[in-house]
Amino acid sequence: MEKFYIITNDMKDANRKITVKIKKCIESYGKKCYLEERPEEGNFSKIKIPKDIDCVLTVGGDGTFIQASRRLFGRDLPMLGINMGTLGYLTEVEVQNVEEAVKQLVEGNYTIEERMMLYGSAAYRNVRDVALNDIVMTRSGSMKIVHFNLYVNGEFLNSYGFYCVQSVCRRTDCGADSVIDCCDTDLLACTQFPQYCFRGQR
């Protein structure tokens, strides 16, 4: 790997202290490293990632990693997440271990774990998108119920039109809930979320 690109969530690394540290560490090995410019608004940039990049690093939490994976859809680029969030089930490296992680990267001491992604579309609104973790179909109004047909790879799977169902989630083994029930398989789960009303007891 010769060229690296760092995507930073400025809500997590506000002064980019960790980001700059990673950049300097990469450059100390004679490699090139580019930092994504701060977005004009929001946490995530819409800038296209250069084509000649060999590896993308994210600095933030799992949300930063997931957002970056969507932007990289269709490109065969490895990603490594530096965890500055809370859970960190996708971001592999903790902040205190970044220098060792960079050393392993530039020396080629790593393995690449393939991840599947979902492609989803809503035909009636012509909406299409991709996801690393899950796609959720949910109602748009407080008094509306979910009613739709679900197709997977062009084949009809199920109809949803029940009052008790608030939304349906189609997820990969990268989803947070899937860490528990998928056990490193390619299992896809389609889960109904019932509508509950929780009230505090006095």
Where are these regions (language model features)?
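ATP/NTP phosphate-donor binding region
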Residues: 1-55, 95-111, 122-129
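Short glycine-rich anion-binding loops that position phosphate/pyrophosphate groups of nucleotides
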Residues: 11, 62-64, 87, 171-172
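Gly/Ser-rich helix-loop-strand patches that form or flank binding pockets
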Residues: 67, 72-85
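Redox-cofactor binding/interface segments in oxidoreductases and associated redox assembly factors
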Residues: 6, 58, 167
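Short glycine/serine/threonine-rich phosphate/pyrophosphate-binding segments
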Residues: 15, 64-69, 167-168, 175-177
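A residue-level signal for conserved active-site and pocket-lining positions in enzyme catalytic cores
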Residues: 9, 57, 61, 83, ...
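Catalytic core of DAGKc-family lipid kinases
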Residues: 87-162
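Gly/Ser/Thr-rich active-site loops/lids in small-molecule metabolic enzymes
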Residues: 158-200
